[in-house]
């Protein structure tokens, strides 16, 4: 499972990637409010820029926790400046909500693609699957999505129905994303399937390995790209498989 944790600097209102467990809520109380009380968050500045890992987010306190128990829902909320990700958690006393921008830089308007594409998502992290699903539904409102946490089921799914793009995590138990990509590319009848990796392992040397395995594109976690960039990259993969 790809894993990223973030620590927060309450003074600068920016997060930094960290490898140690910390109670991020203790450092970001000014960004948390109780839904029952309806108290709005007190933003320290109008030009805040939280580099939140919305694609692999989880609250941590002490030891790393089970994401599926810590997060119950994630949804997009309207914002005048940028789209945001609303994450509800139920483990830190009541129903709290953390609001974070879902992209960095200026928000670029995009036109959703209404084609009825079929997407296959595989990631051993349930929350990653849910958030990627919501991103894709934002970009492709008429798409059909099949998602699984079990990488060993992918080949059976590909043989049972037609998919336009498979989104693969790289580090998974069972079969890795690289192993899956090689298996897919070995079958001529699956050559029309686009393969996109979504992973924290996205150095240039990693991408060379992915390309050699037959992966068409790589998105790095955290997925800090504009919607316009994401849909442009996916469209490029789709066009190449026509």
From Swiss-Prot:
Gene3D superfamilies: 3.40.50.2300. Residues 118-236 form the Response regulatory domain. Transmembrane segments: none annotated. InterPro entries: Bact_response_regulator, CheY-like_superfamily, Sig_transdc_resp-reg_receiver. Coiled coil: none annotated. This is Stress response regulator protein 1. The gene is SRR1. It comes from the Eukaryota. One of its GO terms (biological process) is filamentous growth of a population of unicellular organisms in response to biotic stimulus. Keywords: Phosphoprotein. The modification 4-aspartylphosphate is found at residue 169.
């Amino acid at each position: 499972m790809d894993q990223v944790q973030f620590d927060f600097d309450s003074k600068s209102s920016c997060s930094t990637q960290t490898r140690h467990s910390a109670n991020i809520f203790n450092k970001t109380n000014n960004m948390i409010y109780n839904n029952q009380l309806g108290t709005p968050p007190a933003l320290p500045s109008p030009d805040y820029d939280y580099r939140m890992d919305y694609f692999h987010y989880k609250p941590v306190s002490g030891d790393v926790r089970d994401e599926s128990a810590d997060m119950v829902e994630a949804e997009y909320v309207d914002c005048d400046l940028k789209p945001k990700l609303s994450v509800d958690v139920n483990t830190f006393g009541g129903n709290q909500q953390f609001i974070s921008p879902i992209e960095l830089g200026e928000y670029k308007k995009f036109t959703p693609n209404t084609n009825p594409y079929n997407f296959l998502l595989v990631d051993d992290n349930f929350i990653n699957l849910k958030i990627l699903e919501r991103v894709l539904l934002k970009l492709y409102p008429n798409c059909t999505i099949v998602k699984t946490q079990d990488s060993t089921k992918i080949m059976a799914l590909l043989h049972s129905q037609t998919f336009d793009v498979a989104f693969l995590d790289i580090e998974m138990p069972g079969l890795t994303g690289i192993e899956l990509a090689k298996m897919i590319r070995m079958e001529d009848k699956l050559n029309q399937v686009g393969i996109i990796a979504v992973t924290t392992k996205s150095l240039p040397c990693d991408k060379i390995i992915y390309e050699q395995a037959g992966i068409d594109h790589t998105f790095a976690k955290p997925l800090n790209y504009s919607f316009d960039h994401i849909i442009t990259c996916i469209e490029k993969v789709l066009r190449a498989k026509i």
